[in-house]
Structures are given as C-alpha cells and as structure tokens.
Amino acid sequence: MAFKDTFNKMISYFDTDEVNEVEEDVTASTDNVIPRSQQSVRASSHPKQEPRNNHVQQDHQARSQEQTRSQMHPKHGTSERYYQQSQPKEGHEMVDRRKRMSTSGIANRREQYQQSTCSDQTTIALKYPRKYEDAQEIVDLLIVNECVLIDFQFMLDAQARRCLDFIDGASKVLYGSLQKVGSSMYLLAPSNVSVNIEEMTIPHTTQDIGFDFDMKRR
C-alpha cells in the first residue's frame, strides 16, 4: 500500500507539471493572439478616420481662403455702382459750394465797398439862412460831419453877424473850420475835411459891402 501511494503521487506530480506547461502554452498563445487582433483592429480603424479628417480640414481651408479673398478683393460690380452713385453727388455738392462762396464773396465785397464809399463820401450842403434860428440847423449838419456852404445874402447885417458868431463858436467846440469863400459866403467844414483856399481879391460892390464881417481877425 505504501508503495502504491508513492507511485500515485509520482504520477500525479508529473501530470500536474504537464498540465501547467499546457496552461502556460495556452496563455502565451492567447496573449500573442490578442495584441495581433487589437493591432489589426487599430490598423483597420485608422485608414477610415484619416480620410474623413483630411476632407474636413480641406473644406475648412477652402472656406477660409474664400472669405479672405472676398475681404481682400470685393466685387467689382458693387464698387463701380457705389463710385458711380457717389460721383454725381459729390460733383453737385462741389458746384453748390462754389456758387455759395462766390455769391457770398461778391456780397461781402459790395458791402465793404458801400461802407468805404459811404465813409469816404463828403456831402456839401448849401444853406441860405433867413433868420437867426436857422443857425442851429447848420450846426446840426456839422455834427454829422457834413460840409455846409452858407450864403447870407438873404439876411440883414445884424442878423447875419449874430448867426455867424453862433456858427463860429460851434465850429470851435466841434473842432471844425469856418472860412470865407465869397463876399457873403462861408464854408463850414468838419474836422475830417481840410479846406485849402487860395488868396484872391474879392470885388466889393454896393450889394455885399455889409456882409464883409470881422473875419479878418482870424
């Protein structure tokens, strides 16, 4: 019995070694098979995905290129239409501006010329006083810078002398000048008018002897 047991143990020992070797061979073969199958699956999946990705990238690049071209080079039709529409408007606006500037410039020149002529013009008023109250009207003309040519032929000697004294005093106050230009005529000028009278001999007749007032005192 003891010998039989030892024989069975030896048989079982060798049997387990064979089983282990078989199991190791099976596991190694399975390990080698699984990576090959995974590699085949991966290799088969990559060729399918790469064309799709390339196609998407090409579409995206084509769209981006079209957008950049459209931004850099706009359509000729729209630009020409805009130029044709904007060109007449700009031309009309320039013409209107030039007309306005020319008319305004002419108006300003006219106003300046009128103002200069009005300021440069000197009016000479001819007065024939008949009474003493007319002297105030003559002085009022001197205040507004007008020259007055006074003829006393219609006044008496006493009235003409009083009137002449009043006008002479007013001319001094207003910085004017009073000069005799005839036997019975005197020129009253404002300060901005200079009068140059040449000396001349005035003939004295019986009609105007009384009007040669005390002007020689001046």
From Swiss-Prot:
Cellular component terms per the entry's GO annotation: cytoplasm
Q: Which UniProt keywords apply?
A: Cell cycle, Cell division, Cytoplasm, Septation
Cellular localization per UniProt: Cytoplasm
Biased composition regions of type Polar residues, renumbered to the chain: 28-43
Top-level taxon: Bacteria
- Record family assignment: Belongs to the SepF family.
By its UniProt entry, which PANTHER family does this protein fall under?
Answer: CELL DIVISION PROTEIN SEPF
HAMAP family in the cross-refs: SepF
Function comment? Cell division protein that is part of the divisome complex and is recruited early to the Z-ring. Probably stimulates Z-ring formation, perhaps through the cross-linking of FtsZ protofilaments. Its function overlaps with FtsA.
UniProt protein name: Cell division protein SepF
Q: What is the lineage of its organism?
A: Bacteria, Bacillati, Bacillota, Bacilli, Lactobacillales
